[in-house]
Amino acid sequence: MDLEMTGLDPAKNVIVEIATIITDDNLEIVAEGPDLVVHQSEEALALMDQVVVDMHTRSGLLDAIRSSTLTLEDAGRQTLEFIKQHVPSPRSVPLCGNSIGMDRRFLDAYLPDIRSEEHTSELQSH
């Protein structure tokens, strides 16, 4: 799973994109979930530091956020449904990815149902 956010502080920043991939024990891709861009208000986007604005502008994500109609709740629901289709039982697989600790803080704050599906172990990539 990978999240994109408007910054690094879950108290003031928000999730703007969720992408999920399910792998087997050898990290071979089993299923690719939807790449979900979440609409956020101009007020939420105004809290981004310039480095984040520049990054999301270059990637095209900022325009995609503004044009998206998907709510965070709907994105969370779709992601959870995808995970449950492919994961045998809750908390049975680790979260793998880059900046996992940061993603977990945002999941705790905004999408605790997804967080409760994850095992406490993790595999950090670089």
Report the location of each language-model feature:
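Short, well-ordered beta-to-alpha junction loops that form the rim of enzyme active sites
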Residues: C96-G101
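A generic structural signal for secondary-structure junctions
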Residues: S41, L111-P112, S125
